Each structure stands twice: as structure tokens, then as C-alpha cells.
Amino acid sequence: MRFLTFITITILSCATAVAQELFSPNKVLKLSFSLSAEGTPTYSLFYKGKEVVKPSRLGIELFSSNEVKFGAEITKKEGVNTSLYHNFEVVNTQNTTVDETWQPVWGESQNIRNHYNELLVSLKQKDTHREMNLRFRLFDDGLGFRYEFPEQKQMPYFVIKEERTEFAMTADHQAWWIPGDYDTQEYDYQQSRLSEIRAINQKGRQANLAQTGFSDTGVQTALMLKTDDGLYINLHEAALVNYGAMHLNLNDKTLVFQSWITPDANGAKGYMQTPAQTPWRTVIVSNDARDILASDITLNLNEPCALADTSWIHPMKYVGVWWEMITGMKEWSYTYDVPSVHIGKTDYTTLKPHGKHGATTENVKKYIDFAAENGFDGVLVEGWNIGWEDWFGHSKDLVFDFQTPYPDFDIEAIHQYAKSKGIKMIMHHETSSSIRNYERFMDKAYQLMNKYEYPAVKSGYVGNIIPRGENHYSQWVNNHYLYAIKKAADYRIMVNAHEAVRPTGLCRTYPNLIGNESARGGEYQAFGGSKPNHVCVLPFTRLIGGPMDYTPGVFEMDISKNNPNNHSHCNATLANQLALYVTMSSPLQMASDLPENYRRFPDAFQFIKEVALDWSESHYLEAEPGAYITVARKAKGTRNWFVGNTAGKDFTSKIHFSFLEPKTTYVATIYADAKDANYQTNPQAYTIQKVLVTNKSKLTLHSVAGGGYAISLYPLTDKAQAKGLKKQ
């Protein structure tokens, strides 16, 4: 909800001079725009007078098309000009200033300021008279720009062959990156110089169930960069609607990135009808890494909430029948008796169960009991529905119906049992990437959820996309993801999409999108493990676009203790797993481990039970990509605070509690790595201490590599609470 009025100044001028300059409201950033001698739009970006993006070209390359006319006979005019990147002239410019404050339904802050200066450049191509606008918005912490195509007779339709947006770097920066891929983002991050990307990619990439690379120098956004003189730069996009996701392809000779849009099955990057626009391209810049994490540019470049009523959207903390399957203890499937499943024909009541099915009524009730005993909101159940026996690897269209439970999953009994305990069930819709099939059953699937009062669904898109040849992040498939979110809103259902395109801030417009995976999540700790600094990179990259359903909370790091046949290791300390609930903010948070593992460490589990999901304030206290992150957040509607620190390397954290209310004493419970903690050899070594703090207190704590700490802070309401506690 917006609660401050727009403060706008609009200046219209017929542009006689080609060169234009735009400053951020605080004058720290400067954008320069001009046309080259060939009429190619060009921009550059400066931070405190220092060049961040060298002169970079803008434009679109089209597929050649034929103009077809029907008359006495069909005629074709061939060779339509494919260039939308040169021979332009400026016909008009418009400057605007906006300063507003709006309230998200949920998020890291209760109030978000949207303050920018805007330059709109209207262009016309001299030979074709086609029109294209470039809209630049300069915030105090970065730049957003996009292409806009007014409705016009000269170009009512067009097909994009490639977007030619450039980001020309000033030097061989340090980068935190994952390989460019049309089908997966589930990679460990690399840290290297830009010039080293090619060699690292050529050594091979981690295998995944669906992956399609396109270049040895291709990378995905959000891309995190750091210059040798300490400037932090983040490249991403915002408001990805009706378009393919943007990758970046590096010319490692010139150090120029060019946008590389995910194509469809025919190689097209976008089918457009005017009026149309691209997503925003974003450049966040600061000499302080904390500002990258605190930036609201991605959200501010998205449209306001499109839902008239959001009262049904609530953050959820949940447990689930999931880690048992991920670790290999249980299975999603019900039987080994069928070589293949025919949805609607296979009679499961005649088949022998293999005895390893996880989603049984009896097992689910145990999780419901655990959730109720510990104050959780919901229980996720995967593998409840028929079809898992041959769900993957067969390019199968009719793979699930999203309605029919296995014989040992009594959906009505579970509904009634959960309701009696005050627990909401979370639905699971694995699509096996058969998108047409999911849309075929979507209404009935959502109606089933309404019938049994499921408020949220976890959807999955594992494997190669059907229609065959499509990519996970192409225009058509991205439109499907948004269709599913909009359709879910019609049924008052919240969506947590896994394997979908990485977020670009659309949760502002559709706040029922409460979670995404779209990166290498916690499950990979049971698939061989992730790098110990992975969670210190994700907030600088994947989380720039929106929250992640990372599934933290693993307490048993030795996966073989759960399943003797799985020798994976969770590369984190127990204190690190607690901290993730704060450092990787999300309105949807899972306690992913088994109930029995939490019962072994009830004192540490207390933090997971208490930590909030929705915030009124967030203060980033310390940050360096891949090395450490420390953040303090205030729980919305309370006076309580939570602090989290994750460390990718040995790190001594030094924080000041100046964010606390003045003249107020807080009881701080500190969950930290023990002195002998080690993420490989002694991950469950932690300490818990209680102290009294005020806004004048300071704290120094050591976190080991792969470790961290978590703190809960509650105002002192009774002097008895302070008995025996030291002041910090």
C-alpha cells in the first residue's frame, strides 16, 4: 500500500542535443546517454565520478520476416530490416522525479522508499520510422533501464533474434558466478577474475537433470562483481514478464558483457506485439557490500500489488515429509510392481507396496504431531499422489493428475487430523516439467486444495520441458510460471515454485509468490554437499531477485547417520544452520531435518521455533561476498529482534547493537560456534549463552568457516528475567 504521495517533476523537451545526463537523487551516480555516429544508443554509468560501466551499446536484433498481403493473389515483401540498434535519432526526452513509500505484504522491511530520477528517451529509426523508447531510472544505489515499443503501424509485431544490451566493464573484476544455462541454476558458485571464466567453464560443469549451456563465457544473473579498488557491482534484471530470462555472455578480450536471452524451441528470444516492453536491466553499485544486500531496486522496478485482497497471504514455517526422501531413507513412489504408470488406468489397489513410501497416513500424522507440539504452521508432504513410479526421464506428457492419492495416503483423514491440531497442510505439485499437463489439471488441482484447505503449494519442474525443445527460462515457459501464480491467486493459494526461473521481484506484484528455489538449495547437502561459503554468496546473487526456499535447519550433518548408503556431508555447523533463518530471509521457511534430530538438540531447536518470518526493519551490519554476512531484523508487529551471521571463512564478527530501541534492555540469547567447532569434523559443537544488551552494547564473536551465529533479542519485561545475566 502506498501511503505517501508522488512527488514528481516532469519536463518535456524536444531533444535537439543528442547527449543526455541523469543524476541520482543523492548525486552519487551519473548516467550518460548518447547516440553514436551510426545512430546506436549508448550509455555509461559513473559512481562518485568513477566509471562503472564504460560506453555500452543498446539495441535489439530482429529475425528477418516477410510482409504478407492477401489480394487477388498472395504477395510477400522480403528482407524486412532486422536492425533495431542503429540509424536512430532522438525525437524527444522527458525527465521525471518520483519519491514514494509503499508497504509490501511481507518482506525485509515494512516500508520501502522508491526514489529515483528518470530519463525517457524517444527514438525513431530514420529509414524505417520504427519507434523505440529507452527508459532509465537512476536510484541512489543503482540503475534500471528497459526498452519500450509504442503501438505503431511500422511495427505491430516483431520477433527478437537477440537483445544487444551491453555492460562494458572497466577492468578484469572479481566475479561470483554460475555457468550460463537455459535449464538450471543449481550450481555451486565460482569466484574468479572475468578473464578466468572461460577456462573454468571448459573444465566441465556439475551435472544436473536438465541443463543446456550456450557459451564458455556465459554466466547467469544476478552476477556479483568487485573491482580491485573496492567497488561492488551487481548485474541483474527486474520484472521478467512475457520475455526470456537474461543471461550474460562475456567477450573476455574486451571485458564486455552482452545480454543473452533464453530462446524458445525455434531459437526465438521473444514474440512481441506492440505496445510492448522488456524487463528492466539493473546495475546496483556501492563501495559498501552491505548496500547491495539492502537495495530495493529490484522490487521498486516491479508493478504495485495486483491483488485487491491479500488478507489470505501469510508467512509459514513448516516441516515436512521430504528429507527422508532426499537422503534416500524413503521414496516418493509406492510400488515396484509396474514398469510404467497409465494415469487413470493403473489400479494401485491391486499392486504390492514396496514398504519405503514416505507419504503414508501414519507417517504424515507423526509430522503433524511434531509441528503442533512445536508451534509450526504447516506440513509439506511430497509423494502423496500417484505417478511417481516413472515420473522422470521418459518425456512423459500425462505424468500426474495432481488429484489421486496413493492407497496409503488418506487425504480426508489427514485433513481432519491436521485441522484438529491447528496445522495447515502444504500441497506438492511436481510437474516433471510437463507444463501442458499441469495446465490441463490446474483448476481441478487447485480446487482439491481448496476442498481440503491447503493454503500453499510447492510446485516443481524437474527434467526437460514438455513441450519438447522448450527451455526452462524461455518466454513461453516464463509465461506459464506467471499463469500458475495468477491462477493460484484466483483460488487464494500461495505458491512456492522450484526449478522455475529465478525471481526478479514479481513477488511485489503477486505476493502470493511466497517462495522460489531457483538455485542450489539445501537438498544438495544430501547430494554430495555444497561449498561451505555457498550461503554467503546466495544473498549477493540469487536472493537479489527475491526470497529463496533454501530449506535450512539441518542438525545431523553426517547424512549416513540417517541413511547408511548416503555418505554425503552437510558442509555447515549447526549454528550456521540457525543463522540462515535470518541471513536468508523468506516468508516461507522449512525446518528440513528429521524430527528425531531436532529432539536431540532441543536447546538449539528453540531458535528455529522462535525466529520470525516477516520483518519491519532490516539492518545489514557486516558483509563481504562469499566471506561473511551479518544482519539484524526486527520482527513485524513486535519489539523483538533477531541477528544472524554466516561465515564462508574463519571470521571475527564485531557488531554494535545501535539498532535497538534506546533506553531499553534486551535479553540476548546467543547461539554460536564453539571454540572447537569445525564444519567437517565437529559441526554440532555450539554454545548458548544469555546476556543483557542495550543499544550501546557491542559484541565480538568468532565464526568458523561454514559456521556462524544466531541471536534472539527480547525486551526485558520482568526484572526476574535478568537474574544471573551479565551485561554485555
Regions found by a protein language model. Name each.
Residues Q273-K366, N374, G378:
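An acidic-aromatic substrate-binding cleft motif
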Residues E21-A308, A685:
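N-terminal accessory beta-strand-rich subdomains and adjacent acidic, glycine-rich linkers
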Residues A575-E622, A710-S712:
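Catalytic cores of secreted or luminal carbohydrate-active enzymes
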Residues E362-W384, M449-P455:
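Catalytic domains of carbohydrate-active enzymes, especially glycoside hydrolases
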Residues M1-E21:
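Bacterial Sec-dependent N-terminal signal peptides
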Residues E624-Y666, Y709-S712:
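Carbohydrate-binding surface patches
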